[in-house]
């Protein structure tokens, strides 16, 4: 389509209400609108010719098209911009360009996985405003602080209840269990034995202090800090030995990084580069699993150890690579982490959950979980015992998690100050005392040569 071009020296009349500084983009009052260059520009201005961020076409020689056009009106071309050397044949050479879809630039790899090299400058939002919340109701109400329910104690201190789901008065699993220890009932009198003094603090007059149903919530407002810390090695932890948001973040990042290393070893770099975009969605799945199962830290770290060994051995197997790459990437990481948590929980405490329970939590069919577990056990020769090598792996994963929590400290209640180079006192000492944390290999445990593959070659930072 071509437009005849005729130069005219007709003076253009600007409307009196034109915005100051934008008079050149105001509508034109012209009688000869069919042959004037202003009518051509006004015609072209009604349809978007180019998208945001693309090079704008030069439809008319000597005419500059502005970047942004007024929504309420078109634009005109002043008489000074009419070039006398314009040739009508030049207009037919310019095709109407179709608007191209905007290609969003890929985010840098360190956008989703920030480097936790220093203490955050500002405190994060309270737990009630955290962004990693499950959409559906879970076993423990996530709307409470630290993903737990507060314990309801009556005025007589003899009715302790902590419902698993809001507005549910039915007796729960924990309310039907026997007390952990036989604590003698006292009537607000001073205790006489040293054993009772160590069990019940003097300022806590509750007869069932060691009962599971009282210690069911991690945000109990009573003086639970005075009790002796209980170390959980498996099963459902009544009092978690980690912060929920930190463990969710750590499991999400480490699972994606371990699987990215597996894909890079299998020469699937394009799939590995797409993993950072799945971290945000994967956090919701991990939150759903941890809040429903209440697994202790030992089960989570052992699952990562199983997952690392499994992927390292399977990266050299063609059948495993072909089988897992048929599914979507999100399905792969969810299935692998779920299977690793199942095996870790069954190794530490085989009396807690069945595969049917895991199916209700994760959404996978029970037959599919059975198939995942059978294939995993066959690759491990049906031996879940860590052994000497597994003990060393446990030490490395514990040190890695301590580094992660100390450098990514959160604020719950009181503000706490952490040093990015100081490990937690409860964690085992790091065996790599002479090593320093590199920027590209911060989350992985540092191991001697020959134990784990060198992580900095596959780390995605």
Swiss-Prot record:
One of its GO terms (molecular function) is cyclin-dependent protein serine/threonine kinase regulator activity. GO terms for biological process: meiotic cell cycle; negative regulation of sister chromatid cohesion; positive regulation of macroautophagy; signaling. It is found in: Nucleus. Its main location: nucleus. The keyword Nucleus applies. GO terms for cellular component: cyclin-dependent protein kinase holoenzyme complex; nucleus. CDD domains: CYCLIN_ScPCL1-like (cd20557). It comes from the Eukaryota. InterPro entries: Cyclin_PHO80-like. Residues 75-92 have a biased composition (Low complexity). Coiled coil: none annotated. Residues 75-98 are annotated as: Disordered. PANTHER family: PHO85 CYCLIN CLG1, PTHR15615. This is Meiotically up-regulated gene 80 protein. It comes from Schizosaccharomyces pombe (strain 972 / ATCC 24843). The lineage of its organism: Eukaryota, Fungi, Dikarya, Ascomycota, Taphrinomycotina.
């Amino acid at each position: 389509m071509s437009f005849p071009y005729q130069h005219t020296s007709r003076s253009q009349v600007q409307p009196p209400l034109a915005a100051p500084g934008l008079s050149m983009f105001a509508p034109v009052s012209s009688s000869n609108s069919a042959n004037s260059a202003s009518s051509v520009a006004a015609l072209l201005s009604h349809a978007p010719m180019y998208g945001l961020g693309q090079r704008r076409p030069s439809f008319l020689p000597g005419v500059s098209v502005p970047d942004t056009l007024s929504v309420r009106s078109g634009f005109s071309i002043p008489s000074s911009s009419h070039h006398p050397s314009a040739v009508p044949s030049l207009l037919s050479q310019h095709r109407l360009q179709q608007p191209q879809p905007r290609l969003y630039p890929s985010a840098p790899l360190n956008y989703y996985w920030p480097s936790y090299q220093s203490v955050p400058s500002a405190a994060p939002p309270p737990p009630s405003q955290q962004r990693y919340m499950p959409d559906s109701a879970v076993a423990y109400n996530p709307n409470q602080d630290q993903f737990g329910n507060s314990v309801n104690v009556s005025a007589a201190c003899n009715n302790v209840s902590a419902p698993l789901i809001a507005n549910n008065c039915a007796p729960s699993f924990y309310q039907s269990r026997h007390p952990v220890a036989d604590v003698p009932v006292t009537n607000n009198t001073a205790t006489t034995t040293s054993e009772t003094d160590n069990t019940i603090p003097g300022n806590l007059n509750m007869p069932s202090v060691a009962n599971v149903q009282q210690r069911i919530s991690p945000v109990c407002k009573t003086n639970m800090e005075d009790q002796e810390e209980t170390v959980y090695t498996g099963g459902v932890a009544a009092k978690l030995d980690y912060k929920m948001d930190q463990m969710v973040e750590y499991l999400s990042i480490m699972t994606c990084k371990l699987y990215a290393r597996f894909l890079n070893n299998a020469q699937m770099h394009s799939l590995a580069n797409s993993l950072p975009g799945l971290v945000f969605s994967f956090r919701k799945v991990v939150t759903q699993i941890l809040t429903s199962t209440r697994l202790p830290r030992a089960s989570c770290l052992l699952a990562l150890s199983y997952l690392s060994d499994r992927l390292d051995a399977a990266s050299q197997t063609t059948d495993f690579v072909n089988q897992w790459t048929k599914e979507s990437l999100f399905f792969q990481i969810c299935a692998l982490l779920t299977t690793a948590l199942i095996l870790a929980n069954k190794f530490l405490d085989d009396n807690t959950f069945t595969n049917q329970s895991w199916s209700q939590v994760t959404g996978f069919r029970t037959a599919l979980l059975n198939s995942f577990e059978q294939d995993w056990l066959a690759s491990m020769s049906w031996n879940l015992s860590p052994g000497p090598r597994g003990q060393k792996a446990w030490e490395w994963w514990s040190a890695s998690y301590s580094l992660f929590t100390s450098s990514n400290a959160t604020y719950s209640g009181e503000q706490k100050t952490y040093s990015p180079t100081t490990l937690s006192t409860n964690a085992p000492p790091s065996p790599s005392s002479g090593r320093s944390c590199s920027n590209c290999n911060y989350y992985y445990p540092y191991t001697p040569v020959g134990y784990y593959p060198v992580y900095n070659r596959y780390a995605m930072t």
